[in-house]
C-alpha cells in the first residue's frame, strides 16, 4: 500500500474519536453514514465537473477531496483501501461485462 494512503487512513482512524467540535473528520463520523455518503456524492460531482470544465490542477484537487471523503466513508464501514485493492485483484482478468453480470445473482 502506498504510504501516503496509509497515513491518510491512520489520521482518519485517529480523528474518528476526536471532539466533533474541533475535528472535521470527527464531525462527519458523528453525523453518520448518510451525511458522509452525501459528502462523497458532492465531491464526486465536483470531480466530474472539474474533468469536464476545468484543467488538470482543478481535477487533481477535486479528486483528492473525493479520495479523502471516500476514505472516511470506508473507515465508517470498517473498510480500508486494502479491502478495495483485494476486490480489484479478484476482478483482474475478468471481463467487465461478465463481472457485472455475476453481481445480479
Regions found by a protein language model. Give the residues of each.
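Flexible "arm" and connector segments at domain edges
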Residues: 1-63, 67-105
Amino acid at each position: 500500500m502506498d504510504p501516503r494512503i496509509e497515513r491518510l487512513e491512520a489520521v482518519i482512524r485517529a480523528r474518528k474519536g476526536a471532539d466533533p467540535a474541533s475535528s472535521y473528520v470527527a464531525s462527519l463520523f458523528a453525523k453518520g453514514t448518510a451525511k458522509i455518503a452525501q459528502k462523497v456524492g458532492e465531491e464526486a460531482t465536483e470531480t466530474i465537473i472539474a474533468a469536464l470544465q476545468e484543467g488538470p490542477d482543478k481535477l487533481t484537487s477535486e479528486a483528492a477531496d473525493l479520495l479523502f471523503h471516500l476514505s472516511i466513508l470506508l473507515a465508517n464501514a470498517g473498510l480500508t483501501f486494502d479491502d478495495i485493492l483485494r476486490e480489484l485483484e479478484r476482478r483482474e482478468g475478468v471481463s467487465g461485462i461478465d463481472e457485472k453480470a455475476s453481481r445480479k445473482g
